[in-house]
């Protein structure tokens, strides 16, 4: 157990910091102090995460580290349990990094800035808390904690149909949370003299195969909404299409990863027998999702909806990697989650920049803005190349691991592997079609005279917006050139889980 409560400080710091925002002064009705204060808290939080993990985490140790355990409700063994291992060591800093940049992207927000920035900090706390939770009921509470600020961010800032999108989001996610809670309590309290909610103790328990299957499915419903997995994905395009682009960065960069993390942390690690049964279906659904979402993306007029379907397609690789149950495949899935956290957040920032100048999200109302916005065009092109897995980018490193991951799986027949590989390849071929066509519609050709004439005189990205893009681009290229930067953190844990359970 850790001698100093590093993780507790990291998880709880944003909440009191957010509660102080209403007390901050706002000279002349401005929000400058609020913006800088929130950015400072996010940066401090990110530096705390970086310091803690750099100086107190052993990458060769597959067990839980920096463990903190404080009694809460002892009768059901509900404790404040935190810790990190190879599964969470990458996603937690990613949360801090993307949230800090999203706060910077939210600079133009002027409507109810106190509530907006307080909600961002509350969401920050919930997501970091989920990735560090070592108690299954605490995991559920953190899962629920981020729903409220996300709903506020969606319902109050965004497009004309933002209330519809926010309501759809809360119905889907709250509906998925019900089986998550039932499964968590059943797993912790069923059939043993001493109830336990501790992940470490739950990993050593065994359940009747029928119960394990029911538990697996109950958890899977919640993760299928968050990841998202077809057919529970329809909330995501609506949400991205209406949300403020800084909120979209948080959704694409972090929130989707909560589903993949839960699938590994609980379903794969705690319910290995059921996972072996459902793994082929994960692979099949993942392969279908890659092609389906890529096909639908090309028909989207709204730039943010097109990027949203791109995210759904890329999450298919995560499903295939998890379903492969191989070292290289699972490492590829984890790398894909981190890679997409960077690559998925950046296009929304750039789409927001384009919207701020053109006042339209529709691709057929843009056209030709590349001449007046060359910096935005360059960055958009760079991240489009990363999204279609150009060699030298993190997307290429992740997807090139998922392919051999499924091929090397011993539990699948040769025809199955060939079919899945062909479907994956089709999805990869479709990716440049919808991405490059989006670039063509936005930046090439002639100005659309039907739309706002100010498009031809649109101002290019400023220093703040370029800084956000560069901060996301550098690790994208760095991980692509040296993927061991991430793989060295999670490989020991992956090997341990696979050797003990599969």
Curated annotation (Swiss-Prot):
Alphabetically ordered keywords of this record:
Chloroplast, Membrane, NAD, NADP, Plastid, Plastoquinone, Quinone, Thylakoid, Translocase, Transmembrane, Transmembrane helix
Please name the InterPro entries in this protein's record. NADH_Q_OxRdtase_chain4, NADH_Q_OxRdtase_chainM/4, NADH_UbQ_OxRdtase, ND/Mrp_TM
An example of a Gene Ontology cellular component annotation for this protein is: chloroplast thylakoid membrane
Quote the catalytic activity from the record: a plastoquinone + NADH + (n+1) H(+)(in) = a plastoquinol + NAD(+) + n H(+)(out); a plastoquinone + NADPH + (n+1) H(+)(in) = a plastoquinol + NADP(+) + n H(+)(out)
Main location class? plastid
Its EC number is 7.1.1.-
The keyword Repeat belongs to this UniProt entry's keyword annotation: no
Membrane-protein topology: Multi-pass membrane protein
Gene Ontology biological-process annotations:
ATP synthesis coupled electron transport; electron transport coupled proton transport
Q: Where in the cell is it found?
A: Plastid, Chloroplast thylakoid membrane
Q: Which PANTHER family match?
A: NAD(P)H-QUINONE OXIDOREDUCTASE CHAIN 4, CHLOROPLASTIC (PTHR43507:SF21), NADH-UBIQUINONE OXIDOREDUCTASE CHAIN 4 (PTHR43507)
Q: Which family does it belong to?
A: Belongs to the complex I subunit 4 family.
Q: What is this protein called?
A: NAD(P)H-quinone oxidoreductase chain 4, chloroplastic
């Amino acid at each position: 157990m850790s001698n100093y409560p590093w993780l507790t400080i990291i998880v709880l710091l944003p909440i009191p910091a957010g509660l102080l925002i209403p007390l901050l002064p706002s000279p002349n009705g401005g929000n400058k102090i609020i913006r800088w204060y929130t950015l400072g808290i996010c940066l401090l939080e990110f530096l705390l995460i970086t310091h803690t993990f750099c100086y107190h985490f052993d990458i060769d140790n597959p067990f839980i580290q920096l463990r903190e355990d404080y009694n809460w409700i002892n009768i059901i063994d509900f404790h404040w349990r935190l810790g990190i291992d190879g599964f969470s060591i990458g996603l937690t800093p990613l949360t801090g990094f993307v949230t800090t940049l999203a706060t910077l992207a939210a600079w133009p927000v002027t409507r109810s800035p106190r509530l907006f920035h307080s909600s961002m900090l509350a969401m920050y706390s919930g997501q970091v808390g989920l990735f560090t939770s070592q108690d299954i009921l605490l995991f559920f509470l953190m899962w629920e904690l981020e729903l409220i600020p996300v709903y506020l961010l969606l319902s109050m800032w965004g497009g004309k149909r933002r209330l519809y999108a926010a309501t759809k989001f809360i119905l889907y996610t709250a509906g998925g949370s019900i089986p998550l809670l039932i499964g968590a309590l059943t797993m912790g309290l069923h059939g043993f003299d001493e109830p336990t909610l501790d992940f470490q103790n739950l990993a050593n328990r065994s359940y009747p195969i029928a119960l394990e299957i029911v538990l697996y499915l109950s958890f899977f419903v919640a993760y299928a909404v968050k990841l998202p997995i077809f057919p529970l994905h329809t909330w995501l395009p609506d949400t991205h299409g209406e949300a403020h682009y800084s909120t979209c960065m948080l959704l694409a960069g972090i929130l989707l990863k909560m589903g993949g993390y839960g699938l590994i942390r609980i379903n794969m690690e705690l319910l290995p027998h059921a996972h072996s049964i459902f793994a082929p279906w994960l692979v099949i659904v993942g392969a279908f999702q890659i092609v389906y979402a890529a096909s639908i993306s090309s028909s989207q007029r709204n730039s943010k909806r097109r990027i949203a379907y791109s995210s759904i397609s890329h999450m298919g690789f995560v499903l295939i990697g998890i379903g492969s149950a191989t070292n290289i495949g699972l490492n590829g899935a984890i790398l894909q989650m981190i890679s997409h956290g960077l690559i998925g957040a950046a296009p929304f920032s750039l789409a927001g920049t384009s919207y701020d100048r053109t006042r339209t999200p529709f691709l057929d109302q843009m056209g030709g803005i590349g001449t007046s916005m060359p910096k935005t065009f360059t960055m958009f092109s760079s991240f489009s190349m990363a999204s279609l897995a150009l060699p030298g980018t993190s997307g290429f490193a992740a997807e090139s691991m998922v392919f051999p991951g499924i091929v090397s799986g011993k539990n699948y027949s040769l025809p199955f592997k060939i079919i899945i590989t062909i479907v994956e390849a089709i999805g990869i071929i479709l990716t440049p079609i919808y991405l490059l066509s989006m670039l063509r519609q936005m930046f090439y050709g002639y100005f659309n005279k039907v739309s706002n004439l100010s498009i031809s005189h649109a101002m290019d990205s400023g220093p703040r917006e370029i800084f956000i893009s560069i901060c996301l681009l550098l690790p994208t290229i760095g991980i692509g050139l040296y993927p061991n930067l991430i793989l060295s953190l999670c490989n020991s844990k992956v090997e341990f889980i696979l050797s003990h359970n599969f």
